[in-house]
Curated annotation (Swiss-Prot):
GO cellular component: cytosol
SUPFAM superfamilies named in the record: BRCT domain (SSF52113), DNA ligase/mRNA capping enzyme, catalytic domain (SSF56091), Nucleic acid-binding proteins (SSF50249), RuvA domain 2-like (SSF47781)
EC code: 6.5.1.2
Active site residues of this protein: K127 (n6-amp-lysine intermediate)
Class of this enzyme: ligase
InterPro entries xrefs: BRCT_dom, BRCT_dom_sf, DisA/LigA_HHH, DNA_ligase, DNA_ligase_CS, DNAligase_adenylation, DNAligase_N, NA-bd_OB-fold
GO biological process, alphabetically ordered: DNA repair; DNA replication
KW Lyase (keyword) present: no
Protein name: DNA ligase
Residue ranges occupied by any BRCT domain in the UniProt entry: 621-700
GO molecular function annotations of the record: DNA ligase (NAD+) activity; metal ion binding
Annotated binding of Zn(2+), by residue: C419, C422, C443, C449
Length: 700
């Protein structure tokens, strides 16, 4: 069913759809960030967000300070030494349609305040499907290499990268004193096929695809193994450069890389409109099969480095770049069963069990069915022949049914209204404000549901949370069922309890002296986690990695967050403080308050904090006049856009709030400032002009 045109809607109709979309997007955010189990493709998610934004543009009454957050990476393995990226190594946002490309260009122009007639140069280049890597050269000499990791910390793969023939030990010409070159390590189709032949002849497992082969080869503990693998590299970006970049444009930087002897992709071109970008996308897509290496889209980047600096970043991706992904590959197969999985928040997720089929070079035997509404809408039945795709080339999903192949005995699927694990009622929560039912059905078993407890423990120890090496899903399930770990604090008392136990962990099947010692050491190394990781690990509803980072930066310590969360009753100053953190909003504020209001959570935290001491995050900038201060922008700004001003303030270490309160340190007011300016005067908060702000931060 097609959506009703927005210009044909009444305010009441728009409000209903806005509420429904908000609930749906919030549910998708929750499943992506907190449960690591997204149920829609990036393309579908982006379309939902765009529709949501279009409704607010047409009906400004619907807009609120709340923002929806974006995604994240994976923590480095304990098997490698870690390298802290001096400049974060972030990922790109994705688009999947020509309309979204046009929207990207329009957003960039709006953010920069460019008039229609002003030229905007944007590069286009193939998106290599490999493993991102950062190479550091000092005085022209290659000295270090690191994987992306979680974007802030990666794995030290220096010895392995030295074996890649295309990467010079010394750069040609006169490169900067310090140059961090970033790019993609990949494997060609021919090399991949030849390597799999050797694997088969040696009786070893075959690699699924060139990307997996490249990633596995680069992350070998023995560099001699990497040396025997045919890896290649394309340079396309950079991190730290001292004393200054050798060029002022993206094209110029890549040309400089080439002059230094680094391999760059020859298909990179300069475009000046969305139409030219789309034409280049089509051209590269036509060449895709003949390139000899895997690509999964085309990357667009604003060419000017000055404009890139102005555009800055949103969440964990740049505003000045985006990846235009190729359509996901599809296949048909038979759906043999529908299994209901229970997540750590009690969400019941239907998973299709399929006859194995190859999609995009990967064998798929399971696919998401999203939720009960999607099953009903698509009328998916056990025994149906279904169309599946790897959404965004990653997450398999069922697209629909091939009706002319439906068996006569296939019956409509009835979604369970009780938890398949603990038998508790499973309900769809109703939003008290909107009256809209949640798209996800949840088990009400809470603390008595083993599935939820196990999934919460898995999340707590997962890579993007506390990242406890050796304590994976399988181990947690085993330890839970054996009564060894039933709550987070149990992880940190495991070694002490094991010493007193009659049957030692090392004597269990699958364990031994070494693996047990390594596990205990990994646990010990997580007694002082970064505050943002600790907050994320707690599994607070609506608090994914991005919001955990925002809360950590704002409060600085877990005790401060806990104190505010305890006091965050509706209408309180504490609730307002959380709500006013830029990008957080009321939904998260309510979830934080609910979490700390639950006595069982408080008991679990007391037990956990007896063994764990969360550490404050490193400040972005600590030596600026506004570092640590809470600022509010109001009225029209003349030298920069509102988004640009907020991004600048955050880079300088300030906290940007959406409204004025007693905790506001500074209000920057432009022409047309209204209620916020009046509130600042009432509370005695210092108010300055945009010009004074720029002088204060040294940007006048």
């Amino acid at each position: 069913m097609s959506a009703k045109p927005i210009d044909a809607m009444t305010l009441a109709q728009a409000r209903r759809e806005h509420s429904r979309l908000g609930a749906e997007i919030a549910a998708h955010d929750a499943r992506y960030y907190r449960e690591d189990a997204p149920t829609v493709s990036d393309a579908e998610y982006d379309r939902l967000r765009r529709r949501y934004g279009e409704l607010e543009s047409a009906f400004p009454e619907l807009a609120s300070p709340d923002s929806l957050t974006k995604k994240v990476g994976a923590a480095p393995s304990e098997k490698f030494a870690k390298i802290r990226h001096r400049i974060p190594m972030l990922s790109l946002g994705n688009v999947f349609s020509e309309a979204e490309v046009e929207d990207f260009v329009a957003r960039v122009r709006r953010f920069l305040g460019l008039p229609t007639e002003a030229s905007l140069a944007i590069t286009a280049e193939p998106k290599i499907d490999g493993l991102s890597c950062s190479l550091r050269f000092e005085n022209g000499e290659f000295v270090q290499a690191a994987t992306r990791g979680d974007g802030f910390e990666g794995e030290d793969v220096t010895a392995n990268v030295r074996t890649i023939a295309e990467i010079p030990a010394r750069l040609k010409g006169e490169p900067p004193e310090v140059l961090e070159v970033r790019g993609e390590v990949y494997m060609t189709h021919a090399d991949f096929a030849a390597m799999n032949v050797r694997q088969q002849e040696a009786g070893k497992p075959l690699f699924a695809n060139p990307r997996n082969a490249a990633a596995g080869s680069l992350r070998q503990l023995d560099p001699n193994i990497t040396a025997g693998r045919p890896l290649h590299f394309f340079a396309y970006a950079w991190g730290e450069i001292l004393p200054a970049p050798p060029a002022g444009t993206q094209m110029g930087m890549v040309a400089a890389f080439k002059s230094y002897g680094l391999p760059v992709n020859p298909l990179m071109v300069l475009c000046h409109s969305a139409e030219e970008l789309i034409a280049k996308y089509r051209s590269i897509e036509e060449k895709r099969a003949a390139l000899g290496y895997d690509i999964d889209g085309v990357v667009y980047k604003v060419d000017s480095l000055v404009l890139q600096e102005r555009l800055g970043f949103v969440s964990r991706s740049p505003r000045w770049a985006v990846a235009h992904k190729f359509p996901a590959e599809q296949a048909t197969t038979v759906l043999r069963d529908i299994e209901i999985q229970v997540g750590r928040t009690g969400a019941l997720t239907p998973v299709a069990r399929l006859d194995p089929v190859t999609v995009g070079g990967v064998t798929v035997a399971n696919a998401t069915l999203h939720n009960e509404d999607e099953i009903a809408r698509k009328d998916v039945r056990i025994g149906d022949t279904v169309r599946i795709q790897r959404a965004g080339d990653v997450i398999p999903q069922v697209l629909g049914v091939v009706l002319n192949k439906r068996p006569a005995e296939a019956k409509p699927y009835v979604f369970p209204d009780h938890c398949p694990i603990c038998g508790s009622a499973a309900i769809r929560e109703i939003d008290e404000k909107t009256g809209v039912a949640d798209v996800v059905r949840r088990c009400t078993g809470g603390l008595i549901c083993p599935a939820q407890a196990i999934e919460r423990l898995k999340h707590f120890a997962s890579r993007n949370a506390l990242d406890i090496e050796g304590l994976g899903d399988k181990q947690i399930e085993q330890f839970y069922h054996d009564g060894l770990i039933t709550k987070p604090a149990d992880i940190f008392t495991l070694e002490a309890r094991d010493k007193a136990a009659l049957k030692k962990l090392k004597d269990r099947e699958g364990y031994g002296e070494t693996s047990t010692r390594n596990l205990f050491r990994a646990i010990e190394q997580r007694r002082a986690p970064a505050l943002n990781r600790f907050i994320y690990a707690l599994g607070i509803r609506h608090v994914g990695e991005t919001n955990a980072r925002r809360l950590a930066r704002h409060f600085g310590s877990f005790s401060a967050l806990r104190e505010t969360g305890r006091a965050a009753a509706p209408g309180s100053e504490a609730r307002a403080e959380i709500n006013n953190i830029e990008g957080v909003g009321e939904v998260v504020a309510e979830a934080v308050a609910d979490f700390f209001a639950e006595p069982h959570n408080e008991e679990a935290l007391d037990a956990l904090l007896a063994h764990v001491n969360p550490q404050p995050m490193e400040e972005i900038v600590s030596d600026t006049p506004v570092a640590g201060k809470t600022v509010v922008f109001t009225g029209a700004l003349e030298r920069m856009t509102r988004d640009e001003a907020k991004a600048m303030a955050e880079r300088l270490g300030a906290k940007v709030a959406a409204s004025v309160s007693k905790k506001t340190d500074l209000v920057i007011a432009g022409p047309g400032a209204g209620s916020k300016l009046a509130k600042a005067a009432e509370l005695g908060v210092e108010t300055i002009s945009e010009e004074d702000w720029l002088k204060l931060v040294g940007r006048a």
